């Protein structure tokens, strides 16, 4: 290989760097960078790797708690769940690659998140996939959706990790910018925790896994740190999408865990965004050391690759292990047994420099202080302002003119919103390891928590929920995000679990737009307030910006993955069916208290707003309107009470009220439980029309199926903790009948069989055909 000549300052623009950033690089180096050095800075200072637009805002999130072993900044968050057991959790986005190449974009998102988990020393036990695509009646959106689902199932099923929970949302805001967020969980003994650090000078850097190719070069800057515009062909960006091999990943998982169990590795890092540049600089910077990398030692799958390509390739299924010289032979032996390639490509130095060499002692091709790549990326305080029309939008009432909606129209609106997402999750194997107690399709998933040393059940459960709501956050990013966090906690409560920690994926548009930065800042404040109210930390996350096409940004879409613990898992907290005669009750705080998040309490006679509701967006095509006020203390008290009531068997079946309001939630309970219902709902405000009572989405409400003999006791216990218990009706019969208290007749009166048919068939019928590679 030949030396790289110094660059002219114009090349930095093509690599995604600004003029001030280029000047800062020259200051840090006290010279001009050469081509290779400039490329390394470009990928590490990209939005995807550096969080340069969001870092100062993310610092406001609560990240500390007694359970936190590892918080943000490492490959994954790690929390102590007791008994010497730790859970690693992480969420990432693969939005831009999935818009270009849906199958590989989604598949490699799965592979990347799994490496983040076992890098910490944890065995991956579960995946979660909150997905968002454009309208399914449009061919391109349908093609993207099929490719994404196929990619996740093809990789996850093959690598042997179950996909246990997720979301599937179709909306026009994601027409050109689908969101593929993927979360993963792993379990390990607390003593096996390993960090991505190179602390011991003289240790060797061992590259393990797949060979290095040209796939994914520049992915963090070409795709993840820029939007899409007309005139840019997808094919031009397709080489920046990585290609995955789940069978290579499976072998890599087993090899890495075996060497970690044997104590042969002092630090380990996956090669994700920015490839070897990121892995080498991050491990060195975190460890306060330096590293020399020999690019001629890197196994290549394509001929003629140059140092720039080798150092920035994002080829999948690769890990960089920090190994003392005396342990290298044992590491190689383990890798050979698992048919994993292992090659020494560098060594740890004590001078803090990252050097790229042509040969172990050959010419220096790049010489950069490692910390400047990892720690010295710029941090921007970008301008922020709310949209100019925000105040006017909040004054709109989507229900205007809906006072005389007929029962037939109410029923039609409900059926149009009714769709069981379980069809998507049946493409995935969610029963691997036989740990799944409550599977996908319910409010949360519940897993048996096993001792990672012996594999024996602990008698406790690990609950997982994923939630996001772009409609709420478009109406009010701060309050909407707080509602999302509370909904996630409510979902855990519905399976009897108390929240422990969360990770977030913040999906937004172009950060150079002040309105987008305002949305992001408000989102972080809302998440902070809700987490503080729940008493839980944020232990990691991801920020995906530049989700825009032709200057049009997606609706702000923060997504959370929350975990909780069920302390005594002695029964399955979700029945297979609802028994006729079971009572339907509503559990919630008595009313929204004054002085809580984002605004004063409206008088009780005022109608609950319909802004941000699914009914307003999908049935009235109205994105305007105010959100309901959220009573954080009341919602937290309700979640805690519901979790305890489920565990104590006072509640047989619980379901939170969120998308689609209480009308849709009741219909979903009927469909899942196979029972009709006769229910009367208290009006939400004086003279509230049917659509407001049925479809408004005030947070902090849970529906519960209760045995008749337990209702009075449930009400007494609820009252003692400030939660109201309202009897709404009774399950049974062959019709779904929902009306307003004090009003004659029913606003919704549907045959149960027709309702179930719509619920089960809506999503499969939206796809053009069977999904390739779907699980049987």
Feature annotation, model-predicted:
Residues 3-15, 19-21, 27-38, 176-178, ...:
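Glycine-/charge-enriched secondary-structure boundary and capping motifs
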Residues 3-4, 9-80:
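N-terminal amphipathic, basic-rich helices that act as targeting or association modules
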Residues 45, 49, 58-108, 112-114, ...:
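Non-catalytic terminal/interface segments that mediate subunit docking, oligomerization
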Residues 74-340, 349-353, 357, 380, ...:
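Mobile "lid/hinge" segments at catalytic clefts and subdomain interfaces of large enzymes
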Residues 149, 194-196, 421-424, 693-695:
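Short histidine-centered beta-strand/loop micro-motifs
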